[in-house]
Amino acid sequence: MWGLGARLAGALGVVRVGDGGREAVVGGRTVTADSPRDLRGRLTNALYEEFHAGRGQGGFGADGPPPRRTLRDPALERRLAAAVPHATTPVRGRLVEVLPRPGGDELVVRLPEATVRVRADRLSAPAVPPAPGAYVELALEAARPALSPGFFYVMGSRPLPRPAGPVRRLFVHARDADAAVLLWGAALGALEAAGASYHAKVLSDPQDFPRRDSVVVYLHGDHRPGERAVVAALVPHAGTATAPDTSVFTEELAPGIAAAWDPEDPRPGQDGMSFGQHRAFALASGLIAHALADGEPGDRDAHVVRAFLEAGIDPRHPQHNLTTRPGDRR
């Protein structure tokens, strides 16, 4: 028989949905909407902030600095870039064309995500450009500062498996930007030493700290060596660089360090959401369904369980999907 995990069930004590699914209270924050459909989106955001990111109502008080006009901070990005232990990442693609140029040939290569034009010296295998249509391996920049808004993104020095298969996420709760630089460098160094296949991102806006997902690591293939290495590298900083709490939707590995599996929602049109957004959306759906059913307070968990099952989430362990294999839980 399905039920909600104790941690999530306990957290729901700060949530109330009423007024026919048009008003909700999450912690000390009230959100309203003209319809249950509109409320679901706003409630999803509030649950994401309260239960996953840990920002509560978020933002600065009246005496705090004004909102930034950009999510990028050049000084912080330079520090984050300096902490990356490798310069390039291998990417495999199909050669489309060789373009002779006076200053050196260029290659047009069709990668999984896009078709790019690069200098021929980016070719790492084979040694010389083959005929168009052949597969080649390029050495591209590992650091990609503007790829994910508000985050500094990096690819590991080892190729990712294709197809990707299940992806394990690690979340690190950095207290501030200085702590994030320290934790970022330590995590990447541990991942490289462990031979992990991964990519990762870290908050690049100093005003957005602290967050429970300040650093996010995406582990491919056998996640366990990389996961153990990151935990071992970061545990010595518990209580100083890391804040203790973690997302309600995740599995806590150590204070301020948590893990979960990428969503595997069986319904069409549900891809594209982050882990935290996916879990918060499912939770909001169940809470609003309960409000519309005029059910008893004790029925609320049953509605949330139903919404989680429809979204492919294990309601007892929301860090897992229903498709998570037993061996993946280790």
Give residue spans per PLM region.
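Polybasic, proline/glycine-rich intrinsically disordered low-complexity segments
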Residues: 220-330
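Short, flexible coil/linker segments at or flanking structured domains
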Residues: 140-142, 158-160, 203-205, 245, ...
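Charge-rich, low-complexity segments
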Residues: 1-171, 291-330
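A contiguous, surface-oriented mixed alpha/beta subdomain in the mid-to-C-terminal portion of proteins
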Residues: 171, 180-249
